[in-house]
Amino acid sequence: MAIETLTEGGFNALPGKTLGNQFNYFSGTDSDRAADLQKMLDNGNVKAIFCARGGYGMGRIIDQINFKRFRKHPKWIIGFSDITVLQTHLLSRYKIASLHAPMAAAFNDGESGNEYICSLHNALLGRKANYTAAGDDYNRSGKASGMLAGGNLSLLAHLIGTKSDIKTKDKILFIEDVGEYIYNVDRMMYQLKRSGKLKDLAGLIVGRFTEPKDTVIPFGQDTEEVIRDIVKEYNYPVCFNFPVSHDKENYALKIGVHYKLAVSETMTHLKELSEKKS
């Protein structure tokens, strides 16, 4: 469905060799998947790499990839969830932007014309993002501008101490996750805090934490309360329940690009800025 929709939208689609394959939990062996990604990164005719889905597996192959040619001729890497590994690696090591956005699987629900997939289409056409979201009782009001960084909370926590570790100073950080126990969200947020990832932010965007789980003995807080309390000592604006998630409500966000964030109790406004000159 994604290939059909993209073709109808004027894009030419080139399926990867491992698309639709299966090797245990993965779409191929590590060497096959790495070779497939490498080929797409190096192909000068490919202008964007659209990941089919997330799940797990990028961390197994990231160190096998040679980015030498890609760094000279970068292209959009589109995806989220497990793709956070690749996107964070590209920004932290090479200052290359990427698109945190719906993946191919999102086209299969019969809603390929929804505003979130349209936001991806707009990004690919070079249109600047300008999003307004509903307010939230937990919002901490304020304004900020800075480079956008972030992705899936689990992956961001797991990348700490690796070559792909996220750099957050003066950035607007966004986080989201799915199917996590509340105590684990607490643990991962403290991992970010203790490693210095939360103290020097320009702002924080808390996306959706889809299908949260609680333990038999209740944790005593929901995920929003956990995050609110962990960052309460800092002064930057924080918004909650922003439409970035594992659900269909998932706006395209350009990691590595500058945005302006305005947060109030009644709404959140996120606007992409013109590129800064180096």
Regions found by a protein language model. Name each.
Residues 167-223:
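Internal helical hairpin/lid segments
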Residues 65-89, 97-103, 234-237:
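Short, acidic/small-residue loops that bind anionic groups at enzyme active sites
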Residues 49, 82, 156, 204, ...:
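Buried hydrophobic positions in well-ordered alpha/beta secondary-structure cores of metabolic enzymes
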Residues 208-278:
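ATP/nucleoside-binding phosphotransfer catalytic cores, i.e., glycine-rich phosphate-binding loops
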Residues 1-45:
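ATP/NTP phosphate-donor binding region
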Residues 51-59:
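N-terminal glycine-rich "phosphate-gripper" loop used for MgATP/nucleotide binding
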Residues 14-17, 79, 201-208, 239:
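Short internal beta-strands
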Residues 95-161:
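Conserved anion/nucleotide-ligand pocket segment
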